[in-house]
A protein has these predicted regions:
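C-terminal structural segment of proteins
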Residues: 1-332
Length: 332
C-alpha cells in the first residue's frame, strides 16, 4: 500500500456547484463514503487532481416512499437502507441486499450511489502499483493485455455491487445530473459489458437518485450472495429475484445477477417460465439459463466454473423460496 498522491478536496453544497467543479477540474473524482475509492487510491489506482465530496449535497440524501413509488438519494448510506422501517416494509429486498455489503463500519458511510457505481474488480488489477508494474499493466490500467484472457482485447474485470441486482428486479431507473442538465434512464442502461469502462456516465455526471416504481401486492423479492467469508467480502456471485405467483403458479419472474460479469444484468428468458408451478423442472431450466448467460472469468481467487455453478444454484434456491416451492436439492 502506497502513499496517496496529493489532491485537492472540495465540498459543494448543491448539484450546480458540483457540476461547475467537475467542469473546471478535468479528472476530478466524486467521493461520498469513499470505502472503495480510498483503498484504490492507496494502491495507486488513479491520481485525481481533486476529490469532490458529495456528502454535503442535501438533495442526495432524500428517501421518500409514497403510493407512486420510492425515491432513494445516491447519498443515502447502506446502514440507513438496511435499517429504515419504510424500506423494510415496502422494499425489503433493498434492506436485505444492503445488509450483505462489507461490515457495519463500512455501511455507516458507504452509499447507494457508491455501490451502484462501484469500480469493477480483478485480481490482476486490485494490487499494489509495484505488483501491477512488475506483471505488465493490464487493459484496465492502460496496458495492452488482459491477463485473464491474453488473446482478447476486452477487459473482464467483474462488477461486484450488491444493490444493483436488487434494484434491477424492482424495475428501477436512475436520475443523473451533469453539465448538460438532468436525465433519467433504466438502471440497466447505466452499465455496459466492459470491465475497463463499465459505466455510461458522461464527463462530470453524477448519480442523483434511484427511483423504484410501486411493486405488485403479491410480489416477493430477495437477494443471496456467495463470498469467501461470511462478511466483508465482495460477492463471488450474487442473485436477486422477484417472483409473483397466483394459484400455485409463477405469473412473473425477474432474476438479476452480479459478481460474474463486467455489469449487473437481468436474466433473459424468464418469461418462458411463467404460468408454471415452481417445480424441479422449472427450476432446472432456470439454472440452465443462468449458466448460459453468466460469464465469470479468472478475476477472483476462485475458479470461474465454480462461480457459474454457484450463481445457478443461488438462483434456483432463491426462486424456489420466494415462490413457495419444494424441490429436491439440485445437482449442479
Amino acid at each position: 500500500m502506497e502513499r496517496i498522491a496529493p489532491f485537492k478536496l472540495s465540498g459543494p453544497h448543491t448539484l450546480a456547484e458540483a457540476a461547475a467543479l467537475f467542469a473546471a477540474t478535468p479528472g476530478a473524482r466524486p467521493i461520498a463514503g469513499g470505502t472503495d475509492l480510498i483503498p484504490n487510491l492507496r494502491d495507486g489506482v488513479g491520481k485525481p487532481p481533486m476529490l469532490i465530496d458529495l456528502s454535503g449535497i442535501a438533495a442526495l440524501h432524500a428517501l421518500t416512499i409514497t403510493s407512486a413509488g420510492a425515491t432513494i438519494g445516491a447519498g443515502v448510506t447502506l446502514a440507513r437502507l438496511a435499517t429504515d422501517d419504510q424500506i423494510k416494509r415496502a422494499l425489503p429486498v433493498l434492506a436485505e441486499a444492503a445488509l450483505t455489503v462489507a461490515g457495519p463500519g463500512h455501511r455507516t458511510v458507504a452509499t447507494l450511489g457508491g455501490n451502484l457505481c462501484l469500480d469493477t474488480r480483478c485480481v490482476f488489477y486490485n494490487q499494489s502499483e509495484w505488483w501491477r508494474r512488475s506483471n505488465e499493466y493490464c487493459l484496465k490500467h492502460g496496458g495492452d493485455v488482459c491477463h485473464v484472457a491474453p488473446q482478447g482485447k476486452q477487459c473482464h474485470a467483474a462488477f461486484s455491487g450488491d444493490l444493483a441486482p436488487a434494484l434491477l428486479v424492482l424495475g428501477a431507473n436512475v436520475e443523473i445530473a451533469g453539465p448538460h442538465g438532468a436525465r433519467h434512464l433504466p438502471l440497466a442502461d447505466l452499465y455496459v459489458e466492459d470491465g475497463a469502462a463499465h459505466l455510461t456516465l458522461g464527463t462530470g455526471e453524477i448519480l442523483v437518485a434511484a427511483h423504484v416504481p410501486p411493486q405488485p401486492v403479491n410480489a416477493r423479492a430477495g437477494y443471496r450472495k456467495a463470498r469467501a467469508r461470511g462478511a466483508i467480502d465482495f460477492p463471488l456471485a450474487g442473485v436477486a429475484a422477484r417472483v409473483e405467483t397466483r394459484n400455485g403458479c409463477i405469473t412473473d419472474l425477474r432474476v438479476a445477477l452480479t459478481g460474474t460479469n463486467a455489469r449487473p444484468f437481468l436474466l433473459e428468458g424468464t418469461d418462458e417460465l411463467v404460468g408454471r408451478p415452481p417445480d424441479d423442472d422449472l427450476l432446472t431450466q432456470l439454472a440452465k439459463l443462468v449458466q448460459k448467460q453468466v460469464s465469470p472469468m479468472r478475476t477472483t481467487v476462485t475458479q470461474s466454473n465454480y462461480r457459474r455453478q454457484v450463481a445457478a444454484v443461488l438462483a434456483r434456491r432463491l426462486t424456489c423460496e420466494l415462490a413457495g416451492g419444494v424441490v429436491a436439492r439440485p445437482t449442479p
